[in-house]
Amino acid sequence: MKTYHQKPSEVQRDWYVIDASGKVLGRLATQISTLLRGKHKPTFTPSIDGGDFVIVVNAEKIVLTGRKPEQKIYYRHSGYPGGLKEIPYKMMLAKHPERILRLAVKRMLPKNRMGRRLLSKLRIYAGPNHPHAAQQPKPYIPR
């Protein structure tokens, strides 16, 4: 029997909505990255974008375990000498709660064109509402 390789024309994508309230950041991010990549499907092919669209609501209610809410710091650099910026988790949660989850998922995806394309299928909203009712998303309950 030959190995099955999915073609881009054979891909069928679903829309899933995930409620992030009370969920642990890393565990939720791994399940989202699996959905985006398509690894939950029996037709998974590494070189083909066969994943689904994911909508995450209530990103502001995501949880970290232990002392990470007080200790975690996000870093970015401007590219200039002395241009290192530090943002504590609590400040990032207050200003941009959707960036926390997007960054965690982004770092779990491939670091190439495929990863950037997969990340474009992720929609994150801080509150409980989203404008994607026309796509009829299915509720996804993370295991």
UniProtKB/Swiss-Prot annotation:
<dbReference type="InterPro" id="IPR005822">
    <property type="entry name" value="Ribosomal_uL13"/>
</dbReference>
<dbReference type="GO" id="GO:0017148">
    <property type="term" value="P:negative regulation of translation"/>
</dbReference>
<dbReference type="GO" id="GO:0006412">
    <property type="term" value="P:translation"/>
</dbReference>
<comment type="similarity">
    <text>Belongs to the universal ribosomal protein uL13 family.</text>
</comment>
<dbReference type="GO" id="GO:0003729">
    <property type="term" value="F:mRNA binding"/>
</dbReference>
<dbReference type="InterPro" id="IPR023563">
    <property type="entry name" value="Ribosomal_uL13_CS"/>
</dbReference>
<dbReference type="GO" id="GO:0003735">
    <property type="term" value="F:structural constituent of ribosome"/>
</dbReference>
<protein>
    <recommendedName>
        <fullName>Large ribosomal subunit protein uL13</fullName>
    </recommendedName>
</protein>
<comment type="function">
    <text>This protein is one of the early assembly proteins of the 50S ribosomal subunit, although it is not seen to bind rRNA by itself. It is important during the early stages of 50S assembly.</text>
</comment>
<dbReference type="InterPro" id="IPR005823">
    <property type="entry name" value="Ribosomal_uL13_bac-type"/>
</dbReference>
<dbReference type="GO" id="GO:0022625">
    <property type="term" value="C:cytosolic large ribosomal subunit"/>
</dbReference>
<dbReference type="InterPro" id="IPR036899">
    <property type="entry name" value="Ribosomal_uL13_sf"/>
</dbReference>
<keyword id="KW-0689">Ribosomal protein</keyword>
<dbReference type="Pfam" id="PF00572">
    <property type="entry name" value="Ribosomal_L13"/>
</dbReference>
<comment type="subunit">
    <text>Part of the 50S ribosomal subunit.</text>
</comment>
<keyword id="KW-0687">Ribonucleoprotein</keyword>
